[in-house]
UniProtKB/Swiss-Prot annotation:
Transmembrane segments: none annotated. This is Glutamate 5-kinase. CDD domains: AAK_G5K_ProB, PUA_G5K. The gene is proB. Catalyzes the transfer of a phosphate group to glutamate to form L-glutamate 5-phosphate. Belongs to the glutamate 5-kinase family.
Amino acid sequence: MAKITIKVGSNLLVQQDGQLDKRYIVELCREIGNLMSEGHQVVLVSSGARAAGYGYLNKSNAQEADLYMKQALCAVGQVQLMKLYESAMSFYGIKVAQILLTREDFSHRKRFLNLRNTLIGLTEMGILPIVNENDSVATEEIMFGDNDVLASMFAIGWNADYLLLMTSVDGVIDQNGKVIPFYREDTTNMAIAKNASSRWGSGGITSKIRAARAAAAAGIQTSICNGKKLENIAQFVLTGQTGTVFERVGPIKAKKAWIGFLSKPKGSIFINEGAKIAIENNRSLLPVGVVHIEGDFQAGDVVEIRLDDGTFLGKGIINFSSAEAKKIVGLKSDQLEDVLGYSCSKVLIHIDNLWKRDN
């Protein structure tokens, strides 16, 4: 049994006239039904609400509408989209559930854990969770930006085995028009052809690559592949190969995956070279290695860890508020209680609560 996250974008779900492609949705649900009948657990991350709203109300000029109008039409379209999924999955005796999220649902660990428990309950009951960004309430500060990022974060939070980011081309295409079968971090200078966002979608290939890299770094076998060829889904689960594959790294523990990929940092800790070497050797971050503090945060918040030149090194859960941390910058651990005036932790960020960029 495998845990599979599938993301389909608006460019696959919507026809040129702006109407939902009902035939495609039925065929997609057939592939998902086959996987679930084999005992696999599946989560579908589906775009298309805004396009469905425009189509249902016979509106046009998708990119020209004001934000409030787009959000209103997303609310209308989400209902139509779920009706289609519910109807199509009923042919396989499978019920569906709707999950609408914003970035904040992942940034707060308690909410994230509640979300994960809900997801576990749904999949254990044989229900297909259908996930989308809550476009009707999302603002710029709490938006994912596109569903590629949402799918990646969801797969990481669920500890999925596979993530398929399905698009309208065969994978990541180089400038010669050929598919790159395997994407590796040592080939970051490879020539990748640019592709624009679709009329109805918000993400291009750059977004998909960023999302795929994050999932692979968390131990998830990931592919960017052609969603028009729905047989790619079963092929990837069976062979681990289709489209452009991002080989899994890790896995890492769930808590560190949340810190590294799902949390939203509240500030930044700038450290010296000695502290950098210490955390590279799996040692906790001490105040003596800190040179500068930025941001307003409380004890228990997630902060970025950067070298004093600004180089990003990782993230961690800090044991002090920003006000406290600024008082103990550069101090040795045995000086902390004298400066603060009360008993406190000797470490700024414990290694168990620290995610390194190279994890």
